[in-house]
Amino acid sequence: KNRWLLRFNETECKVNTDSNFTNLKKSNYPFPNMEDLGFSSSPIQVPEFDLNKVVDYDKTRNIPSLDSTSKIGPHLRFGTVSIREIVLKVKDVNSTYLSELIWREFFMQILWHFPHVVNQNFRAKYNGIQWRNNEEEFKKWCNGETGYPFVDAGMRELNKTGFMHNRVRMITASFLCKHLLIDWRWGEAYFAKKLLDYELASNNGNWQWSAGTGCDAAPYFRVFNPSEQIKKFDKAHTYINKWIEDLN
């Protein structure tokens, strides 16, 4: 992060694209529809992003019951907003939020310089981990039926909306890798299938962080206690009760 900030230059964030449009060749090719590309419509709606929520991000970001995150992930993923514009807007507003954007850039650099991370551990010394890879337990994790409320709430939110709060992503990922001892690649692939904001670099980087196999990862002995996480971040069970109806 510190190295990134040292090299950060506002001038490089300003791209005068309008002045370059005249260089583009004009054509009248037919524009394909979604069906032509092999896509079908989904009832899941992509949320609008709201940068007003960035102001208190450092104070509210870990409370999943609050609608306090910007929801900008899908827009960054598909390029409907400019990362340069977002950085310029938030750099003096909330340093914690800026740090999250820097993490995104960091994981992209990791993927570029160390492409083996796509399907291998960043740290080869962890290649010998003996994963249990119990398929029935993995299925319960995917469906939000593990019996651990915080984990199940997160997975049900993901399955229903294509979104999961970042704090809950860490909890569910840690649970899969360090409680169930299921290979992080299984979880990464499931998130890739479900997340609206999925992009390879961040998804891979964060899963390897959770598993302890990444370049700047949570150590293997750091295990998120799903019960203690409730006490810290969802004490009133507001988030859990929203997504696990059978607990109400």
Protein language model features and the residues they cover:
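C-terminal, helix-dominated tail/subdomain
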Residues: 126-132, 190-248
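Short acidic (Asp/Glu) and glycine-rich catalytic loops that position anionic groups and cofactors
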Residues: 65-66, 87, 130-135, 168-171, ...
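Short, hydrophobic/aromatic alpha-helical segments in well-folded domains
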Residues: 71, 86-89, 97, 106, ...
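Extended hydrophobic-aromatic, low-complexity segments
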Residues: 164-167, 181-189, 199-204
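C-terminal substrate/ligand-recognition segments
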Residues: 108, 113, 136-182
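Short, well-ordered loop/turn and helix-capping segments at boundaries between secondary-structure elements
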Residues: 103, 112, 116, 160, ...
